[in-house]
């Protein structure tokens, strides 16, 4: 077993290294400065296709035009902001754009309430600072600093979770394309190819509004939830299969019927309406995302492998549904019970096992 085989999750540029190598070797178009491949090849990497007889798997299943706008934005001097509800593949798309364009998706700042301006610009190795005073050797460079030096892409995840004054530290970086270090009396200009891809949630707790001045420095793309149930089912099926292989889950992949049921329940609760639009549904307090449907089915496989017979049952799915939907014990338990009694119970016999398992979990 190689060292990489023992890693729980590889960065995109390593996980899909063969596809990236094929696209680079087959390149016939002009490659922008600082990029590994042409914009058209980046699009093929993200949306899928066939190159030199090699199948390039789609990384993002959705509106192709949005991906084209994202790629073209990174050709300009504008940064890119991907916004949307939780689970709309913002981080996933950000990672794969960075991997395809620069070959490195690991220059990441994770935005939190505790993120400081030093984590955006630079900080110091204080032992060296005290011993020798300010020097380049004592400088601790942020991911954005390192991306500016090499002309790469820095990723800023959950930017809206940072305090507003910390967010605004980006304004001068995005405007001037340089970081000043007054302690050393010099500044670092951004090399060609440098850009920032930020992500932000539109519907979540614990977020801070971005200032208009900061928003003006970004090209903003809103990533929607999957437009139809067929697309969402395809996304869930593909990701569950990939995760099952990566995690070496010793259980059969979920049947199409199980995926359809989970996605149907999630879409109806998310939209507050049954799929046939005949009955309104009270939505739960939390966000019911595609990412959670993927996580639910993956966990159901783990349950089936460890404590079942290697095949997902209604009881495995019911356990996952309970945890995914009932996030607020007081409000969501009632919402879930009403959905079971008013919607799921009235469906045909093929839903009966899942209904009974869910009722038992929600007792």
Where on the chain are the PLM-derived regions?
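AAA+ P-loop NTPase catalytic core and its hallmark functional loops
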Residues: 2-247
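A diffuse structural propensity rather than consistent per-protein peaks
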Residues: 38, 116, 140, 155, ...
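Non-catalytic, well-ordered alpha-helical scaffold segments
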Residues: 64, 68, 142, 168, ...
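Amphipathic alpha-helical interaction segments
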Residues: 77, 104, 131, 221, ...
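Short, residue-level hotspots on alpha-helical faces of the histone-fold
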Residues: 172, 176, 298-302, 323
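A general alpha-helix detector
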Residues: 217, 235, 299-302, 320
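Conserved AAA+ ATPase small/helical "lid" subdomain
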Residues: 240-311
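C-terminal engagement/docking regions of AAA+ P-loop ATPases
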Residues: 305-363
């Amino acid at each position: 077993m190689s060292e990489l085989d023992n890693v729980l999750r590889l960065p995109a540029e390593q996980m899909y290294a063969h596809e990236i190598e094929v696209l680079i070797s087959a390149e016939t178009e002009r490659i922008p400065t600082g990029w590994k491949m042409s914009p058209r090849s980046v699009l093929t990497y993200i949306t899928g296709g066939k190159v030199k007889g090699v199948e390039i798997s789609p990384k993002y299943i959705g509106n192709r035009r949005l991906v084209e706008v994202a790629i073209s934005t990174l050709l300009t001097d504008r940064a890119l902001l991907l916004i949307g509800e939780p689970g709309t593949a913002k981080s996933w798309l950000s990672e794969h754009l960075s991997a395809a364009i620069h070959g490195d998706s690991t220059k990441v700042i994770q935005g939190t309430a505790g993120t400081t301006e030093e984590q955006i610009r630079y900080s110091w190795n204080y032992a060296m600072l005290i011993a020798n005073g300010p020097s380049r050797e004592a400088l601790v460079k942020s991911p954005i600093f390192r991306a500016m030096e090499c002309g790469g892409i820095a990723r800023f995840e959950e930017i809206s979770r940072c305090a507003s004054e910390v967010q605004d530290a980006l304004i001068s970086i995005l405007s001037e394309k340089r970081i000043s270090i007054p302690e050393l009396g010099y500044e670092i200009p951004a090399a060609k190819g440098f850009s920032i891809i930020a992500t932000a949630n539109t519907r979540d707790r614990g977020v801070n509004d971005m200032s208009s001045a900061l928003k003006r420095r970004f090209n903003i793309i809103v990533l929607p939830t999957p437009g139809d149930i067929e697309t969402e089912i395809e996304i869930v099926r593909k990701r569950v299969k990939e995760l099952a292989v990566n995690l070496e889950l010793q259980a059969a992949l979920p049947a199409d019927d199980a995926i359809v049921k989970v996605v149907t329940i999630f879409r109806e609760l998310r939209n507050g309406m049954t799929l046939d639009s005949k009955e309104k549904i009270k939505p739960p307090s939390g966000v019911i995302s595609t990412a959670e449907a993927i996580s639910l089915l993956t966990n159901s496989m783990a349950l089936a492998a460890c404590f079942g017979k290697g095949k997902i049952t209604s009881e495995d799915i019911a356990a996952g549904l309970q945890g995914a939907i009932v996030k607020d014990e007081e409000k969501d338990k009632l919402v879930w019970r009403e959905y079971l009694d008013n919607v799921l119970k009235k469906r045909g016999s093929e839903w009966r096992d899942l209904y009974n398992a869910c009722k038992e979990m929600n007792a």
